[in-house]
Amino acid sequence: MLTVRLRRGCLALCTLAIVPALGLAQRSGPNPFPGGTNPDGSLRPTPPLSRLFTQDAYTEYAILAPGSEAFRIRFIPEETRAGATELVNATRGGSQGSDIEVYDPRTGKPLKFTYQDEGSDTHAIHAALPMPVPEGGVGRVLIYKTYKDPRTYTMHGEDIVWVRSLSGYRLGVLLPKGFSFLSSNVAAQLTTTADGRLKLAFANPSGQSNPVTIHARRTTAAFPPRNDPDMFFDDVKTLYDLGAPEGGTIKVEQTYSDYRKGDKATLNSLEYLPLTDLRVVDLDTAKTLAVVKNGAASAVKLDVPIVDDRQSAHLQITGTVKDAAYKVVNGELVFERTLHGLRNTVLLPAGWDVAAVSQSGTLGTYQGRAFVALINLNAENNYRVAIRARRGQ
């Protein structure tokens, strides 16, 4: 089973082992894939895609009162380096950070942090992780902070204008209560929060940054709360690691956060993933959790019960599934399956090249193997995808 969390370290080691000549060439000459733009504004090439998943972090921006130039941020980042003891979150130059709070998402308890001047108009939060990141685990924190930035938040008469280049995360933007949207230039889910504020939720399916411009105006309309699930707050990601197509065997690795209250986490994904060799890991501690059957349902007992909204269980499910729809037809690899959740990546066996994908996805290469990464932008939690590939000579 390939481990998604260790992809950065594995990629770095594989790159050093496989292409030392390229490393020497880059040290002695210009980087052939620098990204960014040329002086004339034309784009420069970026490196080939090699990350199986993007958008692990979630960021929510709550626009505060008109004229304040301020917005409140909720940020949930991750740290994957084994042994790391802190997570660093930099403040963008020109944005003044204040009212910072940092919590442990596992327990909901406050964490120690410092807010340091890093020079060049930049500050950074250094949050102490509740424990060193364990081998096979993931460190995470929940950060609340307020930014004041007159370049981002301006007024045009009585109207709000909010413009910001948002990183390639899963995102949410809330208007102040009593305001409605005149326009928003990103495709987004729109709903109303429990306190009557309008909220956009969105993600960039290519994993790139989102240049966002919002215009909003006061309204006398009353917006009743809705219970629409925020499909971009859901951090579930599923890797389908395809074995030889003649055998129809697929290794599955699914990671997600469960916010449901209680001391047990029900494994709902087993309803559509009939896994053998099932293993469930608490990613906060890298501890394997025992699976308990209760009729048709399966669950794990949590070491720390979830009792408030700041808490969640960060779980990883792994196992193997046998699927007759994964096969070879007339010399062509065919993977056809209903996928669930926001993010799914299909990793092809070595030696196969992607020939067709029925849904929109990005293409990349991971350790010499082609992959298709799909992000579901629809409120329906499942969709059918067909991927076809041909064997290279």
What positions do the PLM features span?
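Early extracytoplasmic/domain-onset interaction patches
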Residues: 27-89, 223-267
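Bacterial N-terminal signal peptides
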Residues: 11-21
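Solvent-exposed beta-hairpin/edge-strand motifs
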Residues: 32-43, 80-117, 163-187, 259-290, ...
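C-terminal beta-strand-rich structural cap/linker in extracellular carbohydrate-active enzymes
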Residues: 197-225, 370-393
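Surface-exposed, acidic/Ser/Thr-rich flexible loop segments
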Residues: 52, 119-192, 295-361
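Bacterial N-terminal signal peptides that target proteins for export
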Residues: 2-13
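Beta-strand elements of well-folded, non-transmembrane domains
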Residues: 65-69, 75-83, 145-151, 177, ...
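Boundary at the C-terminal end of the N-terminal hydrophobic targeting segment
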Residues: 23-25
